[in-house]
Amino acid sequence: ELYEAIPADTLIDDVEIPMRIATRGFRVLYDFDSQAHDSQSLEPAREKIRKQRTLAGNYQMLFRHPGWLFPWRNRLWWQLISHKYLRLAAPFLLITLMASNLILIGEPLYQALLWFHGGFYALALLGGLFPPFRMALFSIPAGFLFLNLMSLRGLYYYLFKSAKSGWDSTTTQPAQKN
């Protein structure tokens, strides 16, 4: 009875529907017996599509519902910002950090930070390009870099592609009802 229709092109309806209910002042509760299965694809191409689509959906929600950012309009504002929107800011913060390091390269502290920054990206590239480097030293930076690249791609798809182009199915098997 609290459900209200959402636009047909909504990319992350599993977030938007409960958020619409919560912003109307209701509590959202989930049945303890309910189950959801979202298996990670072992195929990198499918995982890229899935991540890109989810992050495009976060941008879509941010631009459709800017009022949700304010505590007087959304009692879940901090959860939304910390779990969804800070992830969208990360690539821009990383670009700003690199630019700051390059601008201030004459200072010894910023030279050291630039070396650490560059080393992190080198580890990420090794972890992403060479499957034998799947140990945490390489895979964690690679995963972090991958997520931030998908965030930028998600923004691109949200701004320049139709909703359908960001919503190619990645389902490999139908969900089972228990």
Residue ranges and their predicted role:
Residues 166-178:
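Membrane-proximal intrinsically disordered regions of secretory-pathway and membrane-system proteins
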Residues 1-5:
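Conserved nucleotide-sugar donor-binding
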Residues 82-86:
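Alpha-helical membrane-interface segments at transmembrane helix boundaries
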Residues 87-163:
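Membrane-embedded multi-pass helical conduit in multi-pass membrane proteins
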Residues 8-81, 149, 153-157:
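Catalytic donor/gating beta->alpha subdomain of glycosyltransferases that bind UDP-sugars
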